[in-house]
Curated annotation (Swiss-Prot):
<feature type="disulfide bond">
    <location>
        <begin position="305"/>
        <end position="319"/>
    </location>
</feature>
<dbReference type="GO" id="GO:0007040">
    <property type="term" value="P:lysosome organization"/>
</dbReference>
<dbReference type="GO" id="GO:0045824">
    <property type="term" value="P:negative regulation of innate immune response"/>
</dbReference>
<dbReference type="GO" id="GO:1903334">
    <property type="term" value="P:positive regulation of protein folding"/>
</dbReference>
<dbReference type="GO" id="GO:0007566">
    <property type="term" value="P:embryo implantation"/>
</dbReference>
<dbReference type="Pfam" id="PF00396">
    <property type="entry name" value="Granulin"/>
</dbReference>
<dbReference type="InterPro" id="IPR037277">
    <property type="entry name" value="Granulin_sf"/>
</dbReference>
<comment type="subunit">
    <text>Progranulin is secreted as a homodimer. Interacts with SLPI; interaction protects progranulin from proteolysis. Interacts (via region corresponding to granulin-7 peptide) with CTSD; stabilizes CTSD and increases its proteolytic activity. Interacts (via region corresponding to granulin-7 peptide) with SORT1; this interaction mediates endocytosis and lysosome delivery of progranulin; interaction occurs at the neuronal cell surface in a stressed nervous system. Interacts with PSAP; facilitates lysosomal delivery of progranulin from the extracellular space and the biosynthetic pathway.</text>
</comment>
<dbReference type="GO" id="GO:0005802">
    <property type="term" value="C:trans-Golgi network"/>
</dbReference>
<feature type="disulfide bond">
    <location>
        <begin position="395"/>
        <end position="408"/>
    </location>
</feature>
<dbReference type="GO" id="GO:0007042">
    <property type="term" value="P:lysosomal lumen acidification"/>
</dbReference>
<dbReference type="GO" id="GO:0050679">
    <property type="term" value="P:positive regulation of epithelial cell proliferation"/>
</dbReference>
<feature type="disulfide bond">
    <location>
        <begin position="125"/>
        <end position="138"/>
    </location>
</feature>
<dbReference type="GO" id="GO:0005783">
    <property type="term" value="C:endoplasmic reticulum"/>
</dbReference>
<dbReference type="GO" id="GO:1900426">
    <property type="term" value="P:positive regulation of defense response to bacterium"/>
</dbReference>
<dbReference type="GO" id="GO:0060266">
    <property type="term" value="P:negative regulation of respiratory burst involved in inflammatory response"/>
</dbReference>
<dbReference type="GO" id="GO:0001834">
    <property type="term" value="P:trophectodermal cell proliferation"/>
</dbReference>
Length: 589
């Protein structure tokens, strides 16, 4: 039987698995071998499918003609090609084994499973609605739907019809794939299948955004879109192009498209899409990870069983996979002749783990921080910047940095012996100054002054739109007033209805502020001083706002007040402007 697991420990990677009676650890469960003397790792759901032993890859090749008769030449995850003793084989993720076509590799690559309907070993395409067979790659088709390239880590060609092996580039002019080892024929993609996934594979790597997760033994890396993808190896190095990654203890060389280390050189790896973090809600406060089942504990609290649609045992301590029965006297889950031992439960947490717990920052000083595994380096401005590798060498130009052991050269290069790589560009560090009272919080580290709106910027950080409740435009450079739509092509803010906007009530001005009104009264920065109906200075929460005659309301710049001051009428189409600027935390006095 299975114990209910903690989502916090699960997400933080603290759950090492199940310890078998012989001392070994397994990710899901332990099963007795046929002889009954030894234990091996198993998954009761996977073990009900047809199973055969995988074969070792043997000998390098470039085409099927380089392999013995009945063998196939397969591309491995490391970028090399090897002979598989099946006429139509599938390369396993460990890079050393292969399975026949129609089968899927086990996690350790030593077994092949033949699965029907929707195999768990399938590659899930972004959006989680379509999937490709194991050892395939998701690529966009001509019609915008998802297609499958029949090899792992493939390169998707720009024509949206063809693809090339990992490490090769598409030469559409000559209809071929070009790689350092030679040329290959372009491969055609086939349509992806609709996902009908009943059970999810366990994920134990939650990315810093707390919205994306990656499989165990992989690494979260940021993609060009700002979202997170998965590098298919643990403790990987995320390359600065946001497309590739390299093994641990290597350096990304984007000029040569290689991963460099002291002893060897390998091809860059392409990141895979991450999976959305989803929850199974037990009640309004407690949830379990996707693919788990909520079960009550003896205390009445909720616990998490690591299988979808699981059977909760009557002892309120254990659970079994779907289709199994709880045998509390034996302490097993049984389905026919198959028996597996049980484990103990733990309490389900109240919420998802805080991403700041999973990924601690690197402090530069008391007020500035860089992401984990980064190095703090000074910028030309004198502020702190972040070099995206640990223990880096900060170059004297205050723009670049180099890996540990390398020397900074002119024009942004790094050298170590005969090896030369491109230097990495620093990014601005995050300010950790706490929010001032009244400021608008963008995230844990950044805020905008009151009366403004946080908008994402081109740099991937936050910027401030100098309008309250504004609409942030898709180009990440502009913003429009609330209720308007950005027309990026026409560079205008548009509204389908009439040119009317409700006015804003004035607030009494403080004694101290940034904008001097007179008579000892001030308003905050990006506000406008207006006299109220009593003749006392008050503050309009718009920069260059228009004061209404009623002494109670005001309108944004570019509008004028109606006769009664109950409406803001637009004089003309709002001017497209560069509203965004860098956010600066300010005290409100």
């Amino acid at each position: 039987m299975w114990v209910l697991m903690s989502w916090l420990a699960f997400a933080a990677g603290l759950v090492a698995g199940t310890q078998c009676p012989d001392g070994q650890f397994c990710p899901v469960a332990c099963c007795l071998d046929q002889g009954g003397a030894n234990y091996s790792c198993c998954n009761p759901l996977l073990d009900t499918w047809p199973r055969i032993t995988s074969h070792h890859l043997d000998g390098s090749c470039q085409t099927h003609g380089h392999c013995p008769a009945g063998y196939s030449c397969l591309l491995t995850v490391s970028g090399t090609s090897s002979c598989c003793p099946f006429s139509k084989g599938v390369s396993c993720g460990d890079g050393y084994h292969c399975c026949p076509q129609g089968f899927h590799c086990s996690a350790d690559g030593k077994s092949c499973f033949q699965m029907s309907d929707n195999p768990l070993g399938a590659v899930q395409c972004p959006g989680s609605q379509f999937e490709c067979p194991d050892s395939a790659t998701c690529c966009i088709m001509v019609d915008g739907s998802w297609g499958c390239c029949p090899m792992p880590q493939a390169s998707c060609c720009e024509d949206r019809v063809h693809c090339c092996p990992h490490g090769a580039s598409c030469d559409l002019v000559h209809t071929r794939c070009v790689s350092p080892t030679g040329t290959h024929t372009l491969l055609k993609k086939f349509p992806a299948q609709k996902t009908n996934r009943a059970v999810s594979l366990p994920f134990s790597v939650v990315c810093p955004d707390a919205k994306t997760q990656c499989p165990d033994d992989s690494t979260c890396c940021e993609l060009p879109t700002g979202k997170y993808g998965c590098c298919p190896m643990p403790n990987a190095i995320c390359c600065s192009d946001h497309l590739h990654c390299c093994p641990q203890d290597t350096v990304c060389d984007l000029i040569q498209s290689k991963c460099l280390s002291k002893n060897y050189t390998t091809d860059l790896l392409t990141k895979l899409p991450g999976y959305p973090v989803k929850e199974v809600k037990c009640d309004m406060e407690v949830s379990c990870p996707e693919g788990y089942t909520c079960c009550r504990l003896n205390t009445g609290a909720w616990g998490c069983c690591p299988f979808a649609k699981a059977v909760c045992c009557e002892d309120h301590i254990h659970c079994c996979p779907a289709g199994f029965q709880c045998h509390t006297e034996k302490g097993t889950c049984e389905m026919g002749i198959l028996q597996v031992p049980w484990m103990k439960k733990v309490i389900a947490p109240l919420r998802l783990p805080d991403p700041q717990i999973l990924k601690s920052d690197t402090p530069c000083d008391d007020f500035t921080r860089c992401p984990t595994n980064n190095t703090c380096c000074k910028l030309n401005s004198g502020d702190w910047g972040c070099c995206p590798i640990p223990e880096a060498v900060c170059c004297s130009d205050n723009q670049h940095c180099c890996p540990q052991g390398f020397t900074c050269l002119a024009q942004g290069y790094c050298q170590k012996g005969d090896t030369m790589v491109a230097g990495l560009e620093k990014i601005p560090a995050r300010q950790t100054t706490p929010l001032q009272i009244g400021d608008i919080g963008c995230d844990q580290h950044t805020s905008c002054p009151v009366g403004q709106t946080c908008c994402p910027s081109l740099k991937g950080s936050w910027a401030c739109c100098q309008l309250p409740h504004a609409v942030c435009c898709e180009d990440r450079q502009h913003c429009c007033p609330a209720g308007y739509t950005c027309n990026v092509k026409a560079r205008t803010c548009e509204k389908d209805v009439d040119f009317i906007q409700p006015p804003v009530l004035l607030t009494l001005g403080p004694k101290v502020g940034n904008v001097e009104c007179g008579e000892g009264h001030f308003c905050h920065d990006n506000q406008t001083c207006c006299k109220d109906s009593a003749g006392v200075w008050a503050c309009c929460p718009y920069l260059k706002g228009v004061c209404c005659r009623d002494g109670r309301h005001c309108c944004p710049g570019g509008f004028h007040c109606s006769a009664r001051g109950t409406k803001c009428l637009r004089k003309k189409i709002p001017r497209w402007d560069m509203f965004l600027r860098d956010p600066v935390p300010r005290p409100l006095l």
